Amino acid sequence: MPPARDRARLPPGRLETVARAAGRRAGLVVAAYAAGESTTLCRGFTDRGGTLPVTDRTRFELGSVTKTFTSLLLADLAARGPVCLDEPLGALIPRRSLPRSPLAADITLEQLATHTSGLPRLPPGLLRTAAPSWTTNPYQAFPPEALLDSLAVSRLGHPPGTRVHYSNFGVGLLGALLTEQAGTGYDALLRAHVLEPLALTDTTADPAGPQATGHWHGRPRPPFLIPSMPAAGALRSSARDLLRYLRGLIAPHTVTPPGQPLHLALHEVTRPRRRALAGPELALAWTRRVRPAPAPALYFHSGATRGFTAFAGFSRDPAVAVVALTNTAPGLHSRFVQTAYQLLCDLAREPGGRPR
């Protein structure tokens, strides 16, 4: 099946390298933006039956790339005033629901978004409910009402704000707090503040909509369900939407008027926050890497579910972006994300972002 391309100036061979890393049977999309032009390569089918070819409108599960949308939602709400980035949990959650550490009440919303809260990677108790569906839907049996119960028995791994420790729990809790304050669900809140203003019509947290079928070791997987923490990994999206999203982060004035809350939020999420003890800096959910100096600042995030792998990354100067989506879960020796990241690095280091 021949690849679909938007424009020919960005050599499709550059995208082919990423596509090959997904494996021969995968359905995938690789899209890149550089030097003011976009190129998209689509390959394979939405399922192994070979009925529907993958297009740039095919929905793939994003996994943890969802967290970047949640951080943008947080920044937008902070710009509007209902919440503050430095708002502490003690002002939002009853003391009985907080971890026993006296420092827990001081955890801020920003620390939840930047993985510096000290909370564990997963809510205590989740692994017990996950065991029966570990290879299909490990989060589906963990109910939303269990989230605060898990928080109350959590132990902080470090004082808030002192170290980076990746936490699905933290971002999931952040989403729950934002939706509780707004009095609506995650999908509706994100749609009102981010998806509709940015015209991201293919992006949703609804698992019932049309999407590609995910695969794990060649076996089909059901749609990913994460009812207690949708803000940490529930989104599905298309390459077309994700490339538009990244271009909005590159140049906020092209998608929303200057001075508007969302315009301010698109800038806010890329502001450097903290450097891990070993590794790159963090922005608001995004990993930020400037290495080796004076390399361009790269922002990126990957994600995975039991049936999908996703990568999104961009640079503002030069203006480049890469999206890579496949309906195959990452394997032990998978290089799909690493190859997509390398493409981003290569495009950003070429003069003017123009590929050769």
Task: Describe the predicted segments one by one.
Residues 3-62, 82, 205-207:
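Short, conserved catalytic-motif segment at the N-terminal edge
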Residues 31-33, 287, 313, 323:
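Conserved hydrophobic/aromatic positions in well-ordered beta-strands
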Residues 78, 178, 249, 316, ...:
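Short beta-strand segments enriched in hydrophobic/aromatic residues
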Residues 22-29, 50-111, 156-169, 230-233, ...:
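Short active-site loop at a secondary-structure junction
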Residues 40-45, 100-306:
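Short, surface-exposed loop or secondary-structure junction motifs
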Residues 272-280, 291-294, 328-356:
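Short, gly/Ser/Thr-rich active-site loops of penicillin-recognizing serine hydrolases
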Residues 51-52, 309-312, 332-338:
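A short, polar/proline- and glycine-enriched secondary-structure boundary/capping micro-motif
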Residues 39-42, 301, 310-329:
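Short, well-ordered beta-strand elements
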